Each structure stands twice: as C-alpha cells, then as structure tokens.
Swiss-Prot record:
UniProt name for this protein: Glutamine synthetase
Function: Involved in nitrogen metabolism via ammonium assimilation. Catalyzes the ATP-dependent biosynthesis of glutamine from glutamate and ammonia.
Cofactor note as given: Binds 2 Mg(2+) ions per subunit.
Limits of the GS catalytic domain: 106-471
One cellular component (GO) term of this entry: membrane
Activity regulation note: The activity of this enzyme could be controlled by adenylation under conditions of abundant glutamine.
Residue positions binding Mg(2+) 2: 133, 213, 221
Species this chain originates from: Microchaete diplosiphon
EC number: 6.3.1.2
NCBIfam families: GlnA
Gene3D superfamilies referenced in this protein's UniProt entry, alphabetically: Glutamine synthetase, N-terminal domain, Glutamine synthetase/guanido kinase, catalytic domain
Quaternary structure note: Oligomer of 12 subunits arranged in the form of two hexagons.
C-alpha cells in the first residue's frame, strides 16, 4: 500500500511538474484532467479534486454536473509519454453535495463488488487475470455520411497484401488463422511488443509475456499477472493506454475491437478468476478437474447468467461478430477442463490449489473492466449462495458436435440487442446486493440501445448494396 505522503514525496523527489488524473467513463474509456503539481495535497486523496462531469458519457446533466475525483495513492506512476515530468494517478468519483461515492462510477461499483464478497463471508479477495487481444494496423480509415459508408484497415502483415507491389514485397505474411506463433520475419512486431511490455512494467504493471496471436493482419497479445479485482482493472486500462501510445510512436495504430477483420479470428479478453479468503485459495478441491464445490457453483452462476452478463462483458454490436461459429470463439455455454471450445474453461494447472481457477472466454476488451469484473463476481457469488451446479462438463470439441448434439447446448446471444434484453430480464443478481443500482442498469441499457444499437439500425450497410442493389 502506498500512502498519500509517499506520493507527495515522490512528486518532490522526481521534480514532477504535472499530475494527470485519470478516471473511467461508463462505456470504458479513460478520461483525464491535468493539474499543476502544487494543486495536489493530502486532502486530494480524501476530499478529491473538483471537475465538471456534464460531458462524461452516461453520467450527469449540466444542471447537476459538479463532481470530484478522489486520487488513489496506490495507482501513481510516472507517465512515459509526456514531455514534462508527469505523474499519473487513477481516481474514483464522489458526489460533492453528499460526500458519497458516485453510484455510476465504474471503479466505485467494482469496490462495492468486493465489499459485497466480504459481507457474504464467502471470501475476502477476488482475483482476475484478463487476456486482452488486439490488432496493430498501419492504416485505419472509416467514415459514414448520408451517401456513403466504409471502413478500411491495412497491415504490413495482412495476407491480402501478398500480391501488392511494395517495392519489393518481401512476403512472409501470415495465412488466415496461422499467425500463432511463427518467428520473424513472419512476426514483424517482436520489438514493438517488447517495448510495450517493458513500458507497462515501468508503469507498475507486473508483466509476464508477449506473443503474436492467431489472426493475420497484426493480431497480438501481451500478458500480465493476475491481480485483485480493482488492481487488475487498473492494470488493464494501463495496458491499453501503453499499447496504443507505443504503437503510435512506431507510426502504427491499435484497436481492441473484437472483429475488425472479416474471415479471421477476432480479439477476445478471456478472464481468469478465483476467490480467496485469509490468504488461502478456495477453488481447489476433489471434484471435477480438481475444483471445489464452491468453484463449480461459481461456474454455475456464470453459465446461468451468461446471456445477461454479455450485455456488460460484450457490450458492443461488434462483439457479436466475434461470437460466431468457425473462429475459435466461445459461442456455446458449457464448461470443460482444458477445452478451449467451451465458454468456461478450467485450465490444466496441476495439483497446486493456488493455481485453481476458471476462465470465462466470452468477454472482449470493448468492455469496461471494472463493470465486467464486478458483474462476473456477482454472478459467481449468486451461483455459490444458491448452489447452482453447472451440470455435466462437455469434454468433447464443441466445434465437432453434430447439429442434433449442438442444439442441446445453450448458446450466447446473437446480438447486443438480445444481450441487453437478457440483462433487462435478469439483473437481480447484480442489484439485490447493492453492487449495481437499478438506476445504473436502466441507464446502461438505454445508453447502449439509443447510442449504438439503434444508430446501426438507421444506417445502410455496404454489404446490403452487394446483396440488394440490383433488386
């Protein structure tokens, strides 16, 4: 734990000039306000720094927009991308009128999820380990006007460039679904990924590995260690910030969109998770795959509430272009040991109880990690409290099941609209505990429907011209 006094000493010792205060909006984008170093004192870590919240997506109107950012001293790191010495600090949001934590602040909701876990007596720590995939592109252009709509992405690694005159074209472009794990020269991003990883470490993220991913066109992944729920979400936001800015330094652009390329694998964010109490792991036992009853019930909660969960963990229309058969995506709601075709996988981790965990493979990195982790924890707790058994495991390759067998396995919603409908009909597991408020859930659903689902419904799609122009 870092104290406010230690942060203030760091500012003095490192001759920090600016303090960059970062917080997350409802959809999941980091926002920031930068202040001169002398504007921060010990009260900033309790009372906060005032700002106007009227323009923050999903928050307040202009008539009640005053809010305060409360600095978390445990999140301070020197920003490697700023010209002047700048200290970055992540904040949570308070209501200045009441001094209460703001119930639409995602980081506040994440803390309430931990408090809820403790209050149940089931555990005191929830560990999460997200694995967020992304694409590195050389060019990304898109536009939508009254009479046109298009997108165009390109990558030096794109298989579609095999016949392009690149003066000269040196080939070695990964075939579709064959980007995992060829060495250089097929893998052109080794040095960039290493710089990303080391920069993350300098920002306080406990790094592990980096590698190319399955898809052509520059799909990659960096790995960092699992952490407690809030710190894991903090690290994920730092991960995305570092990756995007290092790529920009190389003249490249990064997207965490689940499906930016047609015909190849999409990008997910598999989430490893477990519950501990008094420093001891609780998911190891003598049941299937070496799990405890608690772990199985947790899985039962995840699977029962999965359609509703996806309204939060897969919160974009693009999310459901990834969740389709044929691209190694977890479209079937089942669990299995080591089987990556199941939506919940129990990694093969030997007999060490500390390594026993589950991996929910549906989420993607368009999600707000604080909300996604909190929602998954609530679903798991509901499973434990109500002893929801997940049924029999599915240890066969789901992709090879016959249509008759597959029809018996529940599947993920086919669209964001259907996932939001499931969330509308099944969110008591989120609200009865007080972790999420009814106000938040209804605001979330309305925001997603009005600003995303309905906006796409209004606009012609380029492929519709291919299908229907000559009608």
């Amino acid at each position: 734990m870092t104290t406010p006094q230690e942060v203030l000493k760091l500012i003095q010792d490192q001759k920090i000039q600016m303090i960059d205060l970062k917080f997350i909006d409802t959809p999941g984008t980091w926002q920031h306000l930068t202040v001169y170093y002398n504007q921060i004192d010990e009260s900033s870590f309790t009372d906060g720094v005032p700002f106007d919240g009227s323009s923050i997506r999903g928050w307040k109107g202009i008539e009640e927009s005053d809010m305060t950012m409360v600095l978390d001293p445990n999140t301070a790191w020197i920003d490697p991308f700023m010209k002047e010495p700048t200290l970055s600090i992540i904040c949570s949001i308070k209501e200045p009128r009441t001094g209460e934590w703001y119930n639409r602040c995602p980081r506040v909701i994440a803390q309430k999820a931990i408090d809820y876990l403790v209050s149940t007596g089931l555990g005191d720590t929830a560990f999460f380990g997200p694995e967020a995939e992304f694409f590195i592109f050389d060019d990304a252009r898109f536009d939508q006007t009254a009479n046109s709509g298009y997108y165009y992405v390109d990558s030096v690694e794109g298989r579609w460039n095999s016949g392009k005159d690149e003066g000269p074209n040196l080939a070695y472009k990964p075939r579709f679904k064959e980007g995992y794990f060829p060495v250089a020269p097929t893998d052109t991003f080794q040095d960039m990924r290493t710089e990303m990883l080391l920069t993350m470490a300098a920002c306080g993220v406990p790094i592990e590995k980096q590698h190319h991913e399955v898809a052509t066109g520059g799909q990659c992944e960096l790995g960092f260690r699992f952490g407690k729920l809030i710190e894991a979400a903090d690290w994920l936001m730092t991960y995305k910030y570092v990756i995007k800015n290092v790529a920009k330094k190389y003249g490249r652009t990064v997207t965490f969109m689940p499906k930016p390329i047609f015909g190849d694998n999409g990008s997910g964010m598999h989430c490893h998770q477990s519950i501990w109490k008094d420093g001891k792991p609780l998911f190891g036992g003598d049941k299937y795959a070496g799990l405890s009853d608690m772990a199985l019930y947790y899985i039962g909660g995840i699977l029962k509430h999965a359609p509703a969960l996806l309204g939060i963990t897969n919160p974009t229309t693009n999310s459901y272009k990834r969740l389709v058969p044929g691209y190694e995506a977890p479209v079937n709601l089942a669990y299995s040991q080591g089987n990556r075709s199941a939506s919940v996988r129990i990694p093969l981790s030997g007999t060490n109880p500390k390594a026993k965990r589950l991996e929910f493979r549906c989420p993607d990195a368009t999600s707000n990690p604080y909300l996604a982790f909190a929602a998954m924890l609530c679903a798991g707790i509901d499973g434990i409290k109500n002893k929801i058994h997940p049924g029999e495991p599915l240890d066969r390759n789901i992709y090879e099941l016959s249509p008759e067998e597959l029809a018996k396995v529940p599947s993920t919603p086919g669209s964001l609209e259907l996932a939001l409908e499931a969330l509308e009909n099944d969110h008591a597991f989120l609200t009865e505990s007080g972790v999420f408020t009814e106000d938040f859930i209804q605001n979330w659903i309305e925001y997603k429907l009005v600003n995303e689902v309905k906006q796409l419904q209004l606009r012609p799609h380029p492929y519709e011209f291919y299908l229907y122009y000559d009608c």
